[in-house]
């Protein structure tokens, strides 16, 4: 199967990116090296090409009410210029995908129309787009691809906001987390959508730009000493922050309560949404398993699917695992029975035929200062 390439593919290659297949795309797994890139984001600033992600615009007279029928999070808690994290559900209460919803407010006053921007995972983008369109188009909403041939960048790390402030002259420290605005950046042809969001556990912004503006900004930031980063560092950074990866830490057979995302489920709101009845039953009974954080003794790495052991028997399975460059420890996420999900619980992980000791710990493993 032919792999998609982002508009930054050639620049990633010339910058030293080692390209690998990922979710139907050819993406850089690393540039200078995973640990160097990871450390740059934790201590300074790193730049990611995330143009493989899906970006949809939902537009009409009531986009928030319409999308509310698909997500369990009360979208009316956010207003124009704000955003929230949520999940799409199936009728069984399982997670179809996770997403971020950005409220653009009224975008066509003559028609009384408002708009939302929705960012979805690359691996789910085609299915999500088809399903969302199928559900919302009959309600009079227009669902379109907002990204087109544009570019999505993530600038992350303690210096990220200062870098953008130098280019925009805007105090981005005054922009709340999960807020967004349009920015005029020096040397670019049109305003840039800028959100104070990210997937690294650090402060930073995510930017949606026109193709040539995105290429221009990538070159300028890299020339100015910003470290280009690949999927490898993105994965270790998000794991230290205990941020979920769809398809590994949650899937269509996982409820938000099992995944530790019960805070996204607002059953107190009157709205009916896909999967509500199943989640009401799940809330009453409580989950039989939970996603936990593990720290392992020793340097062996727990990989996806490795058995979690208790009293000599398999009790669960690893979903994500890695060596933590920041903590200098082996860390992992795993599903275990609720009775074993207590902080301090001693467990084991079977790695290449040997059981390595592990302890349930609080998540996230790392929280930025």
From Swiss-Prot:
Matching Gene3D superfamilies: Aminomethyltransferase beta-barrel domains, Aminomethyltransferase fragment, Probable tRNA modification gtpase trme, domain 1
Record keywords, A-Z: Aminotransferase, Transferase
E.C. designation(s): 2.1.2.10
GO CC, any one term: cytosol
EC main group: transferase
InterPro entries: GCS_T, GCS_T_bac, GCST_C, GCV_T_N, GcvT/YgfZ/DmdA, GcvT/YgfZ_C, TrmE/GcvT_dom1
GO biological process, one term: glycine decarboxylation via glycine cleavage system
Catalytic activity: N(6)-[(R)-S(8)-aminomethyldihydrolipoyl]-L-lysyl-[protein] + (6S)-5,6,7,8-tetrahydrofolate = N(6)-[(R)-dihydrolipoyl]-L-lysyl-[protein] + (6R)-5,10-methylene-5,6,7,8-tetrahydrofolate + NH4(+)
Domain of life: Bacteria
GO molecular function terms listed in the Swiss-Prot or TrEMBL record: aminomethyltransferase activity; transaminase activity
Similarity comment: family membership: Belongs to the GcvT family.
Assembly behavior: The glycine cleavage system is composed of four proteins: P, T, L and H.
NCBIfam families assigned to the protein according to its UniProt record, in alphabetical order: gcvT, PRK00389.1
Function: The glycine cleavage system catalyzes the degradation of glycine.
Protein name, entry field: Aminomethyltransferase
High-level lineage: Bacteria, Bacillati, Cyanobacteriota, Cyanophyceae, Synechococcales
């Amino acid at each position: 199967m032919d792999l998609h390439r982002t508009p930054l593919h050639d620049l990633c290659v010339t910058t030293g990116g080692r390209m690998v297949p990922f979710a139907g795309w050819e993406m850089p797994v690393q540039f200078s090296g995973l640990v160097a890139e990871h450390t740059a984001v934790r201590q300074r600033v790193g730049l990611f090409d995330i143009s493989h992600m899906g970006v949809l615009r939902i537009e009409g007279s009531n986009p928030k009410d319409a999308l509310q029928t698909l997500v369990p999070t009360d979208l009316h808690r956010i207003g124009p210029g704000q955003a929230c994290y949520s999940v799409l559900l199936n009728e069984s209460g399982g997670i179809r995908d996770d997403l971020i919803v950005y409220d653009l407010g009224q975008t066509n006053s003559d028609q009384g129309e408002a708009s939302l921007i929705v960012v979805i995972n690359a691996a789910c983008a085609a299915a999500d787009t088809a399903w969302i369109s199928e559900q919302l188009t009959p309600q009079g909403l227009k669902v379109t691809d907002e990204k087109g041939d544009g570019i999505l960048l993530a600038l992350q790390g303690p210096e990220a906001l200062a870098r953008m402030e130098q280019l925009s002259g805007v105090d981005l420290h005054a922009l709340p987390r999960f807020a967004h605005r349009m920015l005029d950046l020096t040397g670019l042809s049109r305003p840039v959508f800028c959100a104070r969001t990210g997937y690294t556990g650090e402060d930073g912004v995510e930017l949606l730009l026109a193709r040539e503006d995105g290429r221009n900004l990538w070159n300028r930031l890299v020339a100015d000493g910003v470290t280009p980063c690949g999927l490898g560092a993105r994965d270790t950074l998000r794991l230290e922050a205990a941020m979920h990866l769809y398809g590994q830490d949650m899937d269509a057979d996982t409820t938000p309560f099992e995944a530790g995302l019960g805070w996204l489920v607002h059953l107190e709101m009157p709205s009916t949404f896909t999967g509500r009845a199943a989640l009401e039953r799940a809330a009453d009974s409580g989950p039989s398993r939970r996603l936990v954080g593990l720290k392992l003794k020793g340097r062996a790495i727990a990989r996806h699917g490795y058995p979690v052991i208790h009293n000599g028997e398999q009790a669960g399975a690893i979903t994500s695992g890695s060596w933590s460059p920041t903590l200098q420890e082996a860390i992992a996420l795993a599903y275990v029975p609720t009775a074993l999900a207590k902080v301090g619980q001693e467990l084991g992980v079977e790695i290449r035929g040997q059981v390595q000791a592990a302890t349930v710990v609080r998540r996230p493993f790392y929280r930025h200062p």
